[in-house]
Amino acid sequence: MALNKYLDVAPEVAQAVAGGKPVVALESTIISHGMPYPQNVETALQVEQIIRDNGAVPATIAILGGRLKAGCTKEEIEYLGKQGQAVTKASRRDLAVLCARGADGATTVTTTMMIAHMAGIKIFATGGIGGVHRGAETTMDISADLEELANTPVMVVCAGAKSILDLGLTLEYLETHGVPVLGYGTKELPAFYTRKSGFEVDYQVDTPAELAAIFHASHELGLKGGMLVTNPIPEEFSMDHEVINRAIDEAIAAANAQGIHGKATTPFLLAKVKELTGGDSLDSNIQLVFNNARLAAQTACELSKL
């Protein structure tokens, strides 16, 4: 497989991977579709700095000019931030088209996992994963993120599944595909903006060292899939359960009324929830990404010792 034909690994990232040093992958959809410019660029650079401060090398992943980038420069992050939603939100089905056309794409959880794995990066920090959408029993709207977690051996550190989803069905899907769902310091699945969901994770894990040991064992056992680490949003940034659920219900009703579906759904719902919560949800979103970056870097450092 002539991967290097399309893959560009940043020198710092390549050096770290080759030397067994800790590296953390980051997605780029959060830059293009997750928040407005210039806040998106500032946040992305802050996340990279948090990873450095915790001893690891950050690798922001994107598709630029048909090249799969494992590690972006500040200029490339700035470019993605300015382009915003004009950049294609790229899932697995888009990769070949974007590469063949020499086009740009912002990576979702799915494509970030794929490109991280190609580049030899084992850990990836994000905000929240996609999952089974509410009403999926009639729409079949299930995020490709879940399929990637079933097939690609990368640890994904997130704040749970986005609470706009059907969390029960999302957990069922992950169980069917053999993906372990670990709760960092919690038995309860966090729901992105809030620390509670009413659903249990498979196992509570309390230290980065144990997270690393579990991932290492999975690798040694030759298990093909990924692993989901759910890290609750810090208490002080957590939103009121009732407030956020009310906003989500309203946002879903608006999406249905406007006939919004497919990959436009999540950006629409997140923007609507932000509007309904007076921007509080965006602040929470930024803080939980910082928190996940910290844990991912600490876990990557522990993994590099094994």
Q: Where in the sequence are the language-model features?
A:
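N-terminal glycine-/serine-/threonine-rich phosphate-binding loop
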Residues: M1-D53, M118
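Solvent-exposed alpha-helices and their adjacent loops that cap or buttress functional pockets
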Residues: Q15-A18, V23-V24, D53, I115-M118, ...
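General beta-strand structural signal in soluble alpha/beta enzymes
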Residues: V24-L26, P58-I63, G105, I123-G128, ...
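Glycine-rich nucleotide/cofactor/substrate-binding loop typically near the N-terminus or early
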Residues: S28, H33-M35, V41-L98, E220-E236
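Divalent-metal (Mg2+/Mn2+/Ca2+)-assisted nucleotide/phosphate chemistry catalytic cores
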Residues: T73-P153
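Active-site glycine-rich loop that binds ribose-phosphate moieties when present
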Residues: T108-V109, E137-A150, V154-E175, A209-A213
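Anionic-ligand binding region
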Residues: R195-E220
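A C-terminal functional module that forms or caps the active site or interfaces directly
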Residues: L223-N291
